[in-house]
């Protein structure tokens, strides 16, 4: 993918149309940490990819909508949900987060994991996602923080990808006034690539919409 194409649907359609899994299929760590104790309800996962988080939520009793701008990714996610036996608890929505409009729909949990629109666009995405959170519901946004040192994962991403990274505090301007931030922090965790262990910081924002 070129630096520009990584942010557009055709590049991801091509990637998801290939052989083999792109992602592990395991739920993302911060989703597990923050959603495991929430009472199941309705959830929206924006940027759902192959559906790993959707499947995890559905297995825990949630009714989940997986949203992504890649039709090929959504097709994979639907197949994975069918194989996991949770198809009846899931549905799929092709939409670009940069132009996302909830259209009056509201969810008890809205989550987005590692979605990185270019040029600081994540603040506007947070604003759009917040509009889809029901009163009393939660918004969880997780992404890559900019590398903070030589031991962090600075070489795995392109310049364009690094410029799209954010800190949790960067996202606060996107929260409407009726949201209460509960978690605003970077959470380091080790990863191993090519036999080398390094740290990645997860920028984690959890907020609750007041009833």
Predicted regions and their residues:
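Conserved class I S-adenosyl-L-methionine
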Residues: 1-38, 147
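A short acidic, Gly/Pro-enriched loop at the edge of an enzyme's catalytic core
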Residues: 98, 102-109
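Conserved SAM/SAH-binding beta-strand->alpha-helix loop
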Residues: 70-72
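A short glycine-rich, Lys/Arg-flanked "PGG" loop and its adjoining helix->strand segment in the class I
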Residues: 123-135
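A short SAM/SAH-binding and catalytic strip from SAM-dependent methyltransferases
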Residues: 108-122
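Conserved beta-strand signature within the Rossmann-like core of class I S-adenosyl-L-methionine
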Residues: 136-144
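Short alpha-helix
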Residues: 162-185
């Amino acid at each position: 993918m070129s630096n520009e194409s990584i942010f557009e649907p055709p590049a991801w359609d091509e990637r998801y149309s290939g052989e083999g899994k792109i992602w592990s299929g395991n739920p993302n760590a911060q989703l597990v940490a923050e959603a495991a104790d929430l009472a199941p309800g309705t959830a929206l996962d924006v940027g759902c990819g192959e559906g790993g988080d959707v499947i995890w939520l559905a297995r825990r009793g949630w009714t989940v909508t997986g949203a992504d701008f890649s039709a090929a990714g959504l097709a994979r996610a639907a197949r994975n949900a069918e194989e996991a036996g949770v198809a009846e608890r899931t549905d799929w929505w092709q939409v670009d987060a940069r132009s996302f409009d909830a259209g009056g729909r509201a969810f008890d949990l809205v989550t987005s994991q590692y979605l990185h629109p270019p040029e600081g666009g994540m603040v506007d995405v947070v604003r759009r996602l917040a509009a889809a959170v029901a009163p009393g519901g939660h918004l969880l946004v997780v992404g890559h923080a900019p590398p903070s040192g030589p031991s962090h994962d600075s070489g795995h991403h392109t310049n364009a990808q690094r410029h799209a990274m954010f800190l949790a505090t960067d996202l606060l301007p996107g929260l409407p006034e009726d949201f209460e931030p509960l978690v605003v922090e970077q959470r380091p965790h080790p990863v191993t690539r090519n036999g080398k262990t390094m740290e990645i910081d997860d920028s984690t924002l959890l907020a609750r919409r007041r009833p």
